[in-house]
Amino acid sequence: MKLGVDVGYSHTKCVGAFGEFKFKSTVLDEVQDVSSSLVIEFEGEMYTVGEDEGLYATEIDKINDKSFKLCLYTAIARAMRNSNEEIIQLVTGLPAQYFKEQKDKLIKSLKGQQVSIKIGTTPDSLEFKEFIIKDVIVFPQSAGVLVTDPKSLVGDTCVVDIGGFTVDVSYFSNRKFKKPYTLELGMNILAASIVGMIKSKYQVSYVYQYIMRKKH
């Protein structure tokens, strides 16, 4: 099975022959009784993945980041659908600035891994999945255009990828990856700043309620 999985700081996105899906890159070390997210059992521990109130995967070092691997393995297990065993050919990404330093280490940490995991929407609905990650390709985030639209990278080109918690900027010269930058910015950070400003200015506890009142 060929899969592209992008474990972003905000959301985890997965694409395969079946189509695509995404969930929030959050992990809780407990099981929620009522939840629209996913429940997994991995190495004897139970987790809730994708819950609004969970902790986001924010570590720069993806190799040793527990949340990164839990989100990655959850995405693969969910993509397996009705299959219980699969051999995975994986494409994933790293923040542009850390690509050269972490690429080989990440490939080494994932390639050949045999993973057993249970996944479901409740503890009572868990299904056993087992997969082997046979091959791993790692791209710098924001470099997908190399595959989807290489003709646009003529001459000197900058590609900007605005994520939830980071902005990746990649400089290309005639399709060659030259300089990467990763800025700790993003739409979630912007949204939090706007919410803070509105709360401060209008002295409201819930921005959504205030907006709804103004609309009427």
Please place each PLM-identified region on the residue numbering.
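Nucleotide/phosphate-binding catalytic cleft detector across ATP-hydrolyzing
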Residues: 1-159, 175-189, 209-216
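Long, contiguous, structured domain-core segments that constitute the functional module of a protein
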Residues: 40, 192-197
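Short hydrophobic alpha-helical module
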Residues: 145, 172-173, 197-201
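A cross-taxonomic marker for long C-terminal extensions/tails that follow the last structured domain
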Residues: 157-178, 194
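A mobile "lid/hinge" subdomain adjacent to the ATP/sugar-phosphate binding pocket shared
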Residues: 195-216
